[in-house]
């Protein structure tokens, strides 16, 4: 598309997807585009997240239906990226500011997780009005009950773990499966479903040595009548060398085969659940209504983020930490 500059700053708004992708980003994006354009906003998109803003990959949306076919699709049609931590004194951050202002953009909506929200907070300190909708499979925001994408990933993991359980049993073997979650154990705990793993290791537990894990499994084999031959581990606790030593020691002391499966990006590409599709649509509507009805929030050094409480009621709160 050709670059188009609109003069009305109050009606120009940009949307980016940022950081790790999460199922439901497309649904949020498309819902936002429709709701914003129905309210006479000039909508821009940033291609490839913050990296795209740095590279001035900013384009206007001319047809609100342009991405409709991707509504149910995982990933993000406008792409995303990892980028440096923004800092108002950093040259690259200043370039992002200059690029946004060159398009007469003052309002920004960020779809992403923890790091993306922190980046948005930096942009508010540079004079921009920034809003966010939480998308992360880690579900690691204490302010909200559910982040978009988390339930999709957990549901998909349940299916994958069930498959791995079948094949492990078929070979009288055990399977250690590493799941994502970063510093939050929500995804691990909600990926198990009805399975009964012989052991689960999260960052809420002690960090065990290989011999300690072997002893734990021995005790459980002797004390538990029913279990599934799965060891579920949260990421960023143990490294590859630890896993390799565990495999070797497992065979030596338990006389069983241990397989290592790291699900990694399979979780990010999970099919989008009906729950996340609806949450994405509802969050977009609530945020746009907030933007339309709040004309006194300019340059407050606060970012505004959509959250849902335990009664699933959506609201917009200040995010300033």
Curated annotation (Swiss-Prot):
Active-site residue list: 138 (proton acceptor)
Chief place of localization: cytoplasm
Cofactor(s) listed: Mg(2+)
GO cellular component, one term: 6-phosphofructokinase complex
Pathway listed: Carbohydrate degradation; glycolysis; D-glyceraldehyde 3-phosphate and glycerone phosphate from D-glucose: step 3/4
Record has Transmembrane helix as a keyword: no
InterPro entries attached to this UniProt entry: ATP_PFK, ATP_PFK_prok-type, Phosphofructokinase_dom, PKF_sf
Compartment(s) of residence: Cytoplasm
One MF term in the entry's GO annotations: AMP binding
Reactions the enzyme catalyzes: beta-D-fructose 6-phosphate + ATP = beta-D-fructose 1,6-bisphosphate + ADP + H(+)
Biological process (GO), any one: fructose 6-phosphate metabolic process
Pfam families for this protein: PFK
UniProt keyword tRNA-binding, yes or no: no
Alphabetic keyword roster: ATP-binding, Cytoplasm, Glycolysis, Kinase, Magnesium, Metal-binding, Nucleotide-binding, Transferase
Residues at which ATP binds: 20, 82-83
E.C. numbers: 2.7.1.11
UniProt-annotated binding residues for substrate: 136-138, 180-182, 235, 259, 265-268
Domain of life: Bacteria
Task of the protein: Catalyzes the phosphorylation of D-fructose 6-phosphate to fructose 1,6-bisphosphate by ATP, the first committing step of glycolysis.
Family in the record: Belongs to the phosphofructokinase type A (PFKA) family.
Subunit relationships: Homotetramer.
Record's protein name: Probable ATP-dependent 6-phosphofructokinase
Encoding gene per record: pfkA
